[in-house]
Amino acid sequence: MALIKEPLKPTGALDEFRSFDVTPIIGTEFPDASLKAWLEDPKADDLLRELAITVSRRGVVFFRRQDGLTEEMQKAIVQKLGVLSGKPATSSLHRHAHQPDPNADPEILWINSEENKKLLAGTPFDPALPARQSCRGLWHNDISYEPNPSDYALLRITQPPALVVADLPAIDTLWASGYEVFDRISRPIQKFLETLTATFGELRERDGSDPKFQVPRGSPANVGTNLRPTHPVIRTNPVTGWKSVYAVGLHVQTINGLASDESDGLKKWFTKLIVENHDLQVRFRWNNANDVAIWDNRCTYHTATYDHEGYGIREGYRACGVGEKPYLDPNSTGRREAR
């Protein structure tokens, strides 16, 4: 039967560029390609449309040493990825209402390890906790607390910590495949989960008088401080037509219609499927200044590694696109079934 949206098919437009799959399930790297060159190429739309398809199929795509890539170029790439793959005409780039630097471009989130400590202070994930024994709760997808959350995101790390400069591994980022989490679940439970929705939200209450919340944050649907939308537990990615488990991570408040113990049990089980199946994860080491990752928030989750205390600041810039309102297409399939 026909899908709500016809999936996009790869065209081979990127075949001339050297690439490799980092793992069989998730992650592809283009070790020599230049995003700046692709953006400025006369065939830019063909290249970036194919990149969008690749990111949506592989979850996350990596690029090395993207020197010369500016924040404006990051924004242009992320917006084009969404537009060329069919996102709503009313969706643009997310405006981060709690940007650490009030004078910064609201469509670029400044990522800074020292500022991140402040955001996590007083939460169960505070890096300063003397006996912090688990980081499993930090897995998340970006801005799922918005009514229309993210499609694609692009992170460029401009300043790796001194550990990396000294050629020692530190503060890698991990991604996990929501497609594969769905495919690891037995069919009867899949069908049950497809009947459920979840309430999402932020960790902190917001000041309703803050004017930054009174303008659209990348979509007319994303206005105001009531950041508690309802999304399906199982979501269809319109670019691929594949199902993934969406209700995972720190922004998920509750699975609707269930007793609290049942909801908490499902949330913990979803996270367990990630952390106990490392073959559905990919780990990326930020080797150089201006290394880049682009991922699809509809079908992946990610988390940083907090192992660089005392070795300097980690800094970067993220552009985050806004896509469609999440939905489950009853005629869509899991990735394995589609293949």
From Swiss-Prot:
Gene3D superfamilies: Clavaminate synthase-like
Cofactor note: Binds 1 Fe(2+) ion per subunit.
EC numbers for this chain: 1.14.11.-
Alphabetical UniProt keywords: Dioxygenase, Iron, Metal-binding, Oxidoreductase
Pathway assigned to this chain's UniProt record: Secondary metabolite biosynthesis; terpenoid biosynthesis
Molecular function terms, GO-annotated: 2-oxoglutarate-dependent dioxygenase activity; metal ion binding
Binding-site residues, substrate: 96, 318
Required cofactor(s): Fe(2+)
Top-level lineage group: Eukaryota
Region (Disordered): 207-230
Entry's Gene Ontology cellular component terms: cytoplasm
SUPFAM superfamilies: Clavaminate synthase-like
Residues reported to bind Fe cation: 140, 142, 302
Record GO biological process: terpenoid biosynthetic process
Binding site for 2-oxoglutarate: 173, 314, 318
Family under the similarity heading: Belongs to the TfdA dioxygenase family.
Function text: Alpha-ketoglutarate-dependent dioxygenase; part of the gene cluster that mediates the biosynthesis of betaestacins. The bifunctional terpene synthase btcA converts isopentenyl diphosphate (IPP) and dimethylallyl diphosphate (DMAPP) into the sesterterpene betaestacin I. The C-terminal prenyltransferase (PT) domain of btcA catalyzes formation of GFPP, whereas the N-terminal terpene cyclase (TC) domain catalyzes the cyclization of GFPP into betaestacin I. The cytochrome P450 monooxygenase btcB is then responsible for the six-step oxidation of betaestacin I to yield betaestacin II.
Protein's UniProt name: Alpha-ketoglutarate-dependent dioxygenase btcD
Taxonomic placement: Eukaryota, Fungi, Dikarya, Ascomycota, Pezizomycotina
